[in-house]
Regions:
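Alpha-helical solenoid scaffolds in large eukaryotic transport, assembly, and signaling factors
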Residues: 1-90, 132, 137
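Helix-rich interaction surfaces within compact, conserved domain-sized segments
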Residues: 72-137
């Protein structure tokens, strides 16, 4: 999962947010970082992958909840909610893979947020696919 995340979001190699920052600011929907969400969110996902043994940390719960919230966002011009609108198709698929990774690899119960996030990101992927298909036919 780590490599898929790095391939889809190359900016994570720049490490614009430290692991310490992420641990001290676990809720990126409340304590919005000074970097764009397209940079911040993948770093939070990477933190979860690299720190899977620290599952008691709030970063896991808040990252899953944030992804659920971002999938439901309706307005691309709202900077603190624009994550899904900034994602390309590969990144959307990678977010879905991350959520599936959470479902299979994490032992704590993140329901109902996790199931909702998976369902909502599946819809994002479907909407993007149908948008692309309709614009090709135009």
């Amino acid at each position: 999962m780590r490599e898929e995340l790095r391939n889809a979001f190359p900016s994570i190699d720049e490490k614009t947010l430290s692991d310490e920052y992420i641990k001290e600011h676990p809720d990126l929907t409340w304590d919005i970082p000074d970097v764009t969400l397209i940079q911040a969110v993948p770093l939070y996902m990477l933190w979860c992958i690299e720190n899977a043994t620290e599952e008691g940390e709030l970063v896991f719960d808040y990252t899953i909840s944030a992804l659920n919230k971002y999938a439901r966002a309706k307005e691309p011009r709202i900077e603190w909610q624009d994550f899904k609108f900034s994602c390309n198709q590969e990144q959307i698929i990678t977010v879905r893979q991350f959520l599936q990774w959470c479902k299979t690899e994490l032992t704590q119960d993140y329901e109902p947020s996790l199931s909702r996030a998976i369902k909502n990101w599946q819809t994002v992927n479907t909407l993007r696919s149908s948008d692309a298909a309709s614009s090709v036919g135009s």
